[in-house]
């Protein structure tokens, strides 16, 4: 039986959560923080316990960024650096898998680059089977191709797996007109269209990912995951973060929300 969230019933039944590599470390640091990983796992496990089918795309920038590695050096080729960055996402994925399963949340780690000893290969039908069995699916190695960001991988997997929303977890509580950590006068947007994001070059996701979400009509919610319970709040329809989509943000108790929550994902 599904657990009842203190924030109310979920609006969405299948969600793609995008976690950057910096989610796995303390602010301003690199590597792995057990405390940060545990905090992510607690929130994700509570969401899964409410009956939400959850796929998580993980980044690897806390360990290595391929694009950064190639600056000012010619020893490591750019494509190689990107592959190195992909392997970093597997480290994060393994850590998150263990943290989730330690909380009793059945989890599967899938990769687009085969690593049979430690993860399952990404096969769409297999991923869907896991989701339908209420297992959390952790997706590592991005798309498996260099020069493609994990944001784009998240947009691709969100569409491929029939997710209703792509939730991008960040350190700030939405999308701003400027960097709020540098500009105290920056204004937070509550709702945006894809066209506004592209026209104004707002820092939501890379342009390829935004274009993919536009083409597939996959809404994006950018929110601050550092605040405990925010993942549950977002899924329950509380007005947090910034909503990017063709239609207005669904809200708890609205007709659109009721229809979304009652529909079973395929």
Predicted regions and their residues:
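C-terminal catalytic "cap/lid" subdomain
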Residues: 1-266
């Amino acid at each position: 039986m599904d657990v009842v969230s203190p924030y109310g019933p979920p609006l969405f039944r299948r969600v793609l959560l995008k976690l950057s590599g910096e989610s796995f470390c303390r602010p301003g640091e690199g590597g792995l923080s057990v405390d940060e990983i545990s905090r992510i796992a607690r929130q994700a496990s509570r969401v899964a316990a409410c009956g939400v089918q959850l796929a998580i795309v993980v980044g690897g920038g806390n360990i290595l960024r391929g694009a950064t590695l190639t600056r000012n050096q010619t020893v490591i080729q750019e494509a190689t650096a990107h592959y190195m960055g992909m392997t970093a996402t597997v480290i994060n994925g393994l850590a998150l898998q263990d943290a989730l399963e330690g909380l009793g949340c059945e989890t599967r780690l899938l990769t687009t680059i085969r690593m049979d000893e430690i993860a399952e290969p990404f096969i769409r039908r297999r991923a869907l089977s896991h989701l339908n069995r209420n297992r959390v699916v952790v997706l590592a190695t991005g798309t498996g191709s260099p020069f493609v960001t994990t944001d784009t991988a998240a947009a691709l997997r969100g569409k491929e797996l029939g997710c209703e929303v792509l939730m991008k977890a960040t350190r700030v509580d939405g999308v701003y007109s400027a960097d709020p950590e540098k500009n105290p006068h920056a204004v937070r947007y509550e709702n945006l269209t894809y066209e506004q994001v592209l026209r104004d070059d707002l820092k939501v996701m890379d342009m390829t990912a935004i274009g993919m979400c536009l083409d597939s009509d996959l809404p994006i919610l950018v929110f601050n995951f550092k605040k405990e319970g925010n993942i549950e709040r977002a899924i329950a329809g509380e007005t947090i973060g910034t909503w990017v989509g063709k239609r207005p943000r669904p809200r708890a108790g609205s007709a659109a929300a009721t229809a979304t929550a009652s529909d079973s994902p395929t």
